[in-house]
Amino acid sequence: IVYWSSNVYEDEAHTSVVGGGSDIMYGVTTDFTQETWEYGGLFLDGGSAGWIDTNILQANGKTYHITKSNSEQIIMESTEAKDWWNYETTEWTRVQSNIGQSRFGSVEGPATFTDHSQENRWYLFVDDLPTPGYQPMVSTNLDEGWEYLDSSDYFLTTYTKHGGVISLTKAQYDALRNADAESAVKE
């Protein structure tokens, strides 16, 4: 499933946005080619405020979406629905609102990933605007939400902005590094 934020217009002239804000749309593909691409439709209705920057996390039989709302900052909702992408039939339960706002102010660009060394531990990066950029949060129980990660065990350069995180095991990382034609480190 591929998802993105978009305005949906009432007419071809793009004079009026349906609902007034951005929605999260989705499509499906098995191999990221045009031959298998299929437009799915509406995933999350943004209403008048709009949704942007969503991230999907699946764990313990549930699907969670962590999404930037233009009115509520970052929120997290969960569902046990097997067809969680189906807007018409999926009921979402709010887990947490205003994620990261009390410390960082305006945040967006949520990115989640699993800790490969500790079971039931996930990380969430939220982009603190305009600087310093990504700030880390942590959860050991997704149904209880996210907490600030206060630790000297991590380092992110200033202006690390939102995008995606690819969660790799050490073995996967080593395999990628070994496949490099030339070392990225110059001596």
Which residues make up each language-model segment?
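Carbohydrate-active catalytic/glycan-binding domains of CAZyme proteins
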Residues: 1-187
